[in-house]
């Protein structure tokens, strides 16, 4: 069976890691010259640190030696002696480039796939890869399946405050002030390996309605039964529960579980984020 690795910022739950056997590359977080692990800087502490200092936190490149050790450990537990690494989108982070460089040390035993996305959308790809590997799929079959999954995944999220986008240099001070004053929430989506702006809405209720509408449109486009997740960063639990209730009122036979999103995404978009993740149910995730 082919082993599977991905990044710690893929927001895979401990239970899922246990049954899937996925190995994680630990993504470091940097703030004012200090380097932290995600365990050392969980979302609540991360948010407080950024708010207190007014300085951004960023995900840093993973050290080559750490990548090599993780690959070696995963290979040792693989019956086939082969490994697939699912990396976060190469347009978002340097992790794909680092993993691909290190993979060269292992020859044909390691294949690195550009996941083209982040957070739990990346985690879903890794879980599906592990599910396929458990069924005996080879490199080519896994790569083709993940390419199709990427094309048929919806990841759209509403940002609560513009302050973190300002701190990270994505918008200016004036734009952040006006946007917060008006109660505007940007709606962002990951499409074709990039983050794109979809809309700006006023208030939580409008944000949830827009996410619900995006799900309806996606379901109509795919014409398939979906897997649904209501993601949230810290502080976004209430909005996620509201979204969950509205999704379940429409898609009565489909669960839409809440899924916490960790420090990697929080560092970039802040607390209070609510997201919808959807993809066809035929893409199995093992025991999920």
Swiss-Prot record:
Binding of hexadecanoate, residues: 59, 93
**InterPro entries (alphabetical):** DegV, DegV_C, DegV_domain_contain
Output the Gene3D superfamilies linked to this UniProt entry: 3.30.1180.10, 3.40.50.10170
Which keywords describe this protein according to UniProt? Answer: Lipid-binding
Q: Could you tell me which Pfam families the record lists for this protein? A: DegV
N-terminal signal peptide: none
Annotated TM spans:
none
Q: What GO MF annotations does this protein's record show?
A: lipid binding
For the DegV domain, which residue ranges apply? 2-280
Q: What does this protein do?
A: May bind long-chain fatty acids, such as palmitate, and may play a role in lipid transport or fatty acid metabolism.
| UniProt protein name | DegV domain-containing protein DR_1903
Organism this protein belongs to: Deinococcus radiodurans (strain ATCC 13939 / DSM 20539 / JCM 16871 / CCUG 27074 / LMG 4051 / NBRC 15346 / NCIMB 9279 / VKM B-1422 / R1)
């Amino acid at each position: 069976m082919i082993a599977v690795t991905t990044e710690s910022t893929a927001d895979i739950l401990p239970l899922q890691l246990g049954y899937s056997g996925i190995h994680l590359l630990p993504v470091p977080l940097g703030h004012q010259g200090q380097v932290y692990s995600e365990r050392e800087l969980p979302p609540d502490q991360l948010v407080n640190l950024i708010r207190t200092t007014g300085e951004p936190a960023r995900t840093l490149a993973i050290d080559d030696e750490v990548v090599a050790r993780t690959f070696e450990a995963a290979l040792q537990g693989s019956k086939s002696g082969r490994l697939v690494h699912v990396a976060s989108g190469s347009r978002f982070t340097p992790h794909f480039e680092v993993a691909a460089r290190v993979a060269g040390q292992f020859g044909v035993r390691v294949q690195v796939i550009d996941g083209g996305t982040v957070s739990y959308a990346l985690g879903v790809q890794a879980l599906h890869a592990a599910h396929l590997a458990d069924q005996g799929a080879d490199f080519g079959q896994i790569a083709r399946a993940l390419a199709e999954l990427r094309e048929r995944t919806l990841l759209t999220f509403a940002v609560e405050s513009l302050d973190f986008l300002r701190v990270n240099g994505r918008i200016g001070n004036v734009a952040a002030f006006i946007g917060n004053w008006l109660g505007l929430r940007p709606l962002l989506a990951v499409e074709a390996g990039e983050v794109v702006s979809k809309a700006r809405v006023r208030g939580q209720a409008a944000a949830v309605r827009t996410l619900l509408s995006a799900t309806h449109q996606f379901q109509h486009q795919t014409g398939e039964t979906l897997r649904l997740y209501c993601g949230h960063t810290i502080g976004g639990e209430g909005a996620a529960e509201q979204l969950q209730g509205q999704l379940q009122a429409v898609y009565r036979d489909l669960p839409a579980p809440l899924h916490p999103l960790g420090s990697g995404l929080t560092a970039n978009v802040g607390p209070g984020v609510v997201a919808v993740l959807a993809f066809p149910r035929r893409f199995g995730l093992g025991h999920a």
